[in-house]
C-alpha cells in the first residue's frame, strides 16, 4: 500500500455557491491509503484447456480422463507450489484456488506442462509424455467441462483467467452460435496462439481414438503422431 497526501480547502469564502467557478473546493491535508490493483508478475501462463471426449478404457477417473490443463513456463521456476488452478463452474463465479502444484515440482523456461486426470489416457490419446516436457497427475479439482472458466493463481492471487467466471456459454447453445467471443470448448480444447485463444470446435473429439484421428488435432501435437515422426 501507499500513502497519498491530499489537501482540502475552499476558494471563495463562506458564501461560495457550487455554480460559481470562482468558489471551488480544493484538496488539503488528508491521508489516503490504497492497495495496488495490479496482479503480481507470473512466470507461468495458461496455454491450453482440454475437455476431450476420450473413451474410458478402465482409467478409473469416472469419465474425466480427457480433462487437462496446459501451462507454459515463461521463465525458470524453482518451486511450482506457489502456483495453483481454480475451475469456475457453470458461470457461478470463482470457487477459489482448488489445485496446487507439488512443492517438489519445478520448471525450466519454455516447459510445456500438462496437468491431467489420467496420464495413461493422455498418453494413449496424444502421446502426451513425449509431446510435453512434463505431464503431472492432478487431483479431482481438474474437473472442467467445456463451459467452465479457468483461473491461474500465484501465491493465492489470480494472475490469469481463461473465459469468464460469471458466464456460462452453454446458455447461448452449444458452440454459442455466431458469437465471436464465445469460449465454449465442450469435448474439445482451447489453445493460446500469439496471446489469443483459438478453439478446436465443440464436440470435435467425439468418436476419436487419438487426437490425430480428429478434425481438431491439438496444436502442440501437430506433426507429432508417433508413426509419422
Where are these regions (language model features)?
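Extracellular beta-strand-rich recognition modules
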Residues: 2-15, 19, 115-116
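Acidic glycine-/aspartate-rich tracts in secreted/extracellular proteins
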Residues: 11-14, 38, 73-79, 89-93, ...
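Extracellular carbohydrate recognition
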Residues: 12-35
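Low-complexity, Pro/Thr/Ser/Gly/Ala-rich linker/spacer regions in secreted
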Residues: 31-43, 216, 220-229
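A structural motif detector for short, solvent-exposed N-terminal "entry" segments of globular domains
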Residues: 38-91, 142-145
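Conserved beta-structured recognition patch
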Residues: 82, 136-221
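Short aromatic-acidic-glycine turn motif
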Residues: 87-101
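Intrinsically disordered, low-complexity Pro/Gly/Ser/Thr-rich segments with frequent PxxP/GP/PP motifs
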Residues: 98-124
Amino acid at each position: 500500500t501507499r500513502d497519498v497526501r491530499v489537501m482540502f480547502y475552499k476558494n471563495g469564502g463562506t458564501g461560495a455557491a457550487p455554480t460559481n467557478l470562482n468558489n471551488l473546493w480544493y484538496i488539503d491535508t488528508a491521508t489516503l491509503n490504497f492497495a495496488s490493483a495490479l496482479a503480481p508478475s507470473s512466470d507461468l501462463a495458461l496455454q491450453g484447456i482440454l475437455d476431450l471426449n476420450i473413451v474410458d478404457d478402465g482409467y478409473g477417473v469416472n469419465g474425466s480422463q480427457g480433462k487437462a490443463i496446459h501451462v507454459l513456463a515463461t521463465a525458470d521456476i524453482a518451486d511450482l507450489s506457489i502456483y495453483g488452478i481454480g475451475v469456475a463452474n457453470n458461470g457461478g463465479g470463482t470457487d477459489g484456488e482448488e489445485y496446487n502444484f507439488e512443492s517438489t515440482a519445478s520448471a525450466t523456461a519454455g516447459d510445456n506442462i500438462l496437468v491431467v486426470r489420467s496420464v495413461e489416457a493422455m498418453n494413449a490419446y496424444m502421446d502426451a509424455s513425449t509431446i510435453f516436457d512434463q505431464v503431472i497427475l492432478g487431483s479431482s479439482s481438474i474437473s472442467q467441462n467445456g463451459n467452465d472458466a479457468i483461473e491461474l493463481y500465484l501465491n493465492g492471487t489470480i494472475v490469469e483467467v481463461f473465459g469468464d467466471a460469471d458466464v456460462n456459454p452453454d446458455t447461448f447453445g452449444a458452440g454459442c452460435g455466431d458469437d465471436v467471443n464465445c469460449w465454449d470448448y465442450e469435448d474439445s480444447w482451447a489453445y493460446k496462439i500469439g496471446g489469443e485463444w483459438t478453439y478446436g470446435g465443440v464436440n470435435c473429439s467425439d468418436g476419436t481414438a487419438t487426437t490425430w484421428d480428429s478434425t481438431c488435432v491439438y496444436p502442440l501435437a501437430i506433426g507429432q503422431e508417433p508413426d509419422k515422426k
